[in-house]
C-alpha cells in the first residue's frame, strides 16, 4: 500500500511553493536542503513553522518543499501558504483555526508596476522650476 501524501501549492509575491506532507517525525526539506541550510534568518523559519505550531502538528509530518521565484521573504510566505493548504487536505477540521489566524487567504500584495513618465510606480522625476 502506498503511503499517504498530501500536496498543495502556495504563492506569495512572485514565489511559488509546491508542498508535500507525509506522516513522519517533523523534517522540513526545502529544495533538497534542510530548513536551517536554506533559510538563514530565524524570522523566515518562524513564518514557515507558524501553521504547524498553531494546529499542534509540529513533529507529526515530514514536509518536502520545492520553491522557486522571488526572494527569501516571499518564498517563506509561499511555503507557509502551501503548508496551510496541505494541512487542510490532511485534516479539513483545521479550517476554522487556520481561517481565524488568516493563513488560508493568499496575500495578494505584490510590487506595483512602474508607470511611464515617472521614476517608479509612484515617484516622479525631479522637478526643476528653472
Curated annotation (Swiss-Prot):
Gene Ontology biological process terms from the UniProt entry: translation
Region Disordered, residue ranges: 110-130
Compositional bias annotation for Basic residues: 111-130
Any GO CC annotation of this UniProt entry: cytosolic small ribosomal subunit
Keyword set, alphabetical order: Ribonucleoprotein, Ribosomal protein
GO molecular function, one term: structural constituent of ribosome
Protein family according to the UniProt entry: Belongs to the universal ribosomal protein uS9 family.
Protein name from the UniProt record: Small ribosomal subunit protein uS9
Organism from which the protein derives: Syntrophotalea carbinolica (strain DSM 2380 / NBRC 103641 / GraBd1) (Pelobacter carbinolicus)
Gene from which this protein is expressed: rpsI
